[in-house]
Amino acid sequence: MALSNSNSTTATVTLPDTLRFWPWQRHINPHYSACKKASSEWCESFKAFSPQAQRAFNKCDFNGCRIGCDLMNLFFIIDEHTDIASAETARTQANIIMEAIRDPEMPRSENEWVGGKAAQQFWLNATKSATPSAHRRFIDAFQMYMDAVVQQAADRSKNYVRDIDDYFVVRRDTIGAKPSFAICELYLNLPDSVMEHPVIMKLTELCIDVIIIGNDLCSYKVEHEHGDDGHNLITVVMNQFKITPQEAMNYISDLHDKLAVQFLDEWKNIPTFGGPLDLEVRTYCHGLGNWVRANDSWSFESERYFGKRGIEIQTTRQIEMNIQSHL
């Protein structure tokens, strides 16, 4: 469905406190400071951002060790370029990225889009640590991510807004959680029989959906102000039900609560496989829970979505924005 004409008003909206009962608490990787500095310098060396975007980017904080930081930075490079690209350009960029990841030893052209070299260097470093299973799953997940980014560009070029069910199908890949989870299992040897177990698959999908909701709640103001909110669940819900942004936020907050309860209930059903594998399974599942908290903390503590008011807004939950109601 294409967006209809809109009327603009200024309003204060309340961000739902979606993680009020989430048991995983905020914590920082002990190697974070050193990894963040090295990874930020690496990313800046590609000159992939405009000066204004680079200044904003440098204010952001990233969770995890060096490989995790590099992946987040690679996501930012991809977002910076594909968010304004046509479907055709996004496909070309996606192909460059995947060629670099599938064959990182192949020299990249100096005239090639910068994302190729960034992906190559990231993956060459990551493969030094990745187990074979994590290596394979990351490549598969990143292909799905890039394909979905191309689909997002196609939707944007047509001013097309999906319904809720169709949106989740695409967003589960554009959110970038699947390749991120593959990095979480970088040192783990989890066979397909584990990852394809119904409980593990359900926990993974529930976690992704919870992250989508948290991300879309926090990113909506910035995306809306830049006229790029078509790929956001708030817009999707507003468009489908003809309701206000606050009503849409409340709707998806209720959905978030239901999904979070399902995740915690499903957690009780984590299977046992025997021996050391059980510890690796628990490590992966705790990584899912931690990722939800990390995404929320980063959304407020970085300056990407709320500028210098992030911590204040995390407490008050109040944001002022210029609302365009698609009714």
UniProtKB/Swiss-Prot annotation:
UniProt keyword annotation of Disulfide bond present: no
Superkingdom classification of source: Eukaryota
Keywords: Lyase, Magnesium, Metal-binding
Cofactor needs: Mg(2+)
Keyword tRNA processing found: no
Sites where the protein binds Mg(2+) 3: 215, 219, 223
Protein name: Delta(6)-protoilludene synthase HYPSUDRAFT_138665
Organism, scientific name: Hypholoma sublateritium (strain FD-334 SS-4)
